[in-house]
Amino acid sequence: MKHKILISSALAAVTTLALPVQAQVVTGTLGAPSATTTIEGKQLPNPDPKFGGVIKDEALQSTPWWAPRIVPPAAAPNVLLIITDDSGFGVPSTFGGVIPTPTMDRIAAQGLRYNRVFSTALCSPTRAALITGRNHHSAGFGVISEQSTGFPGYNSIIAQDKATIGRILLDNGYATAWFGKDHNVPAFAASQAGPFNQWPTGLGFEYFYGFIGGDANQWQPNLFRNTTQIYPFQGSAPGQWNLVTAMADDAIDYMTRIHQIQPDKPIFIKYAPGATHAPHHPTKAWVDKISAMHLFDDGYNKLRDKIFANQKAMGIIPQNATLAP
């Protein structure tokens, strides 16, 4: 099965996915429980099909009929969409930065680097635009959710007619999941009492493992699985349990589970770690690893000169670009 990894920054780059539209195809015996179909996707949600069986006064004279189960087109890719907080355009080595991101580098070498994507200077608006493919005002997020005003475009509510990528792919047969930060829940709905229609599970993501709001303590986060609060860090020694690692482990478990049960079912994951947003709680292993690289010893000015030169050499910025004073 093909795979696609899309990587985004809340302040840098955003990418979107487009799959080719195919005519409806039914596999198996139409009306049988095992029948499947692809859909054109011109209408969302897809209308329910009419009953194709026969109903008579007696059961023996009647014919049962099951609607074909919707599945994606053959060879539909797995998609991993990563969005990080407060990490600029020139942070990862993939875009000329000094932070080594070798896996992203390998992926980019076989794919595309986007450098002209709309991004706001705020968290919630960028995320709303990313998951809906619309201007952030159209998705209700002119500001972050905590500053919503109750006016159109600023009420922090993603309307039902603004389908998320998760909803669209779920309706087309994907398994969908959201890991990490969700800063697109209205403040009045951000508790254990809900309502949950604006949480990931209400927006087309079947599985959610993460936190609601702009930031989280990475050692003891306000953590949820779907809409139930969980406390996996309880009983751990200080500095032992960390959300960054736990979130990655849970995402791997999720992908493994789906592929073991239904290997041909593609997966869409929105992966949104919050660790690069304050409060910063890296593990000792990461602190030691990055410190040993001495990446920032030359100071800010020399660092930005180096990144700027790297980006020109990689063709990420125009050759005639000039560095701001």
Predicted regions and their residues:
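Long, non-globular segments of proteins
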Residues: 30-33, 276
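Gram-negative bacterial Sec-dependent N-terminal signal peptides
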Residues: 2-21
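A generic structural signal for short, non-catalytic loop/turn and secondary-structure boundary residues
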Residues: 16, 32, 201-204
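Compositionally biased regions
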Residues: 9-10, 35-37
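Formylglycine-dependent sulfatase
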Residues: 37, 42-325
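Cleaved targeting-peptide boundary
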Residues: 23-30
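Alpha-helical and His/Cys-centered functional microenvironments
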Residues: 7, 28, 281
